[in-house]
């Protein structure tokens, strides 16, 4: 059996794709499956904050130790990394990114490769487990979280196995989606994601994950017990009412409800006139804002793994900015359940040579 989280989870997933004859089952959690989509890039945008901090805190330090540098040169390379890590936001301002100073001493040779392949091409395809999911022939249990950096990769792997896996793989495939962040397997606050405590029903960490792993592998490797094999293939935590639910597919059976952006042309900040409703707009003015790349909107909570806390965080300071357009529904008359992927169709133009548009769904 193969088991692991994060980097070790990569090994488990890639091992499943390699399909060695002795492999009988896999349990992978909080890990990437497609190293382009949702890991190095998100919808074509380089994951700058995450990649900077991940590379210098984990990868580059190990690489430097293997370069055979003289003591003085090694100390200088490590000092450069430490200085960069002390100021993630300041380091992120360096242009061009491909010439990031801390990585010019051999500490991260892959950095230039990543930035040289901004689109999904053969460079990424050759290590994409999702694209090769049809090669997986063993039972797979994989687990991620709403606030995990790797959420998208797990959802993509689930879809790929259900679409392209053979019947036995589909029947034996199980997916768990909890309310944690990426550090759930060693978190000192195992029921929390950011500022929200979801209660004892979501406790995770070694004391919870180890029994689950033993149960899974006892069944598939030793023929003991009933494994983690409920009839439903998906177990997910429904935030808001804070309960675990089960479904036969992901996303669960649902209806798509489109919401539309409205304003009188002044949707800037939470004090603006932006409104979100299910009524299509007619003739309305455009909303605009001034984008300053040297004063970007800060990452606040969410699926992050950088120098800010992931999970549920207060968005007030973000929504008070004039370069953020805010559209809010009227007070809800009854609870609304939102489960599954959320997408935005945006019509926009910009005078900037290069810019990105992002959208965030926030519980008010």
Spans of features found by a protein language model:
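Short beta-strand/loop motif that positions the catalytic acidic residue
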Residues: 136, 142-144
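Catalytic cores of eukaryotic secretory-pathway lumenal/extracellular enzymes that build
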Residues: 12, 22-28, 33, 126, ...
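Active-site-adjacent alpha-helix of alpha/beta-hydrolase-fold enzymes
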Residues: 152-173
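C-terminal, loop-rich substrate-recognition/catalytic regions characterized by aromatic stacking residues
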Residues: 74-102, 185, 190-364
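Short beta-strand immediately N-terminal to the catalytic nucleophile in serine-hydrolase-like folds
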Residues: 2-4, 29
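Acidic catalytic loop of the alpha/beta-hydrolase fold
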Residues: 146-151
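Glycine-rich nucleophile elbow surrounding the catalytic serine of serine-hydrolase chemistry
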Residues: 4-14
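Accessory cap/linker subdomain of secreted extracellular hydrolases
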Residues: 17-19, 24-135
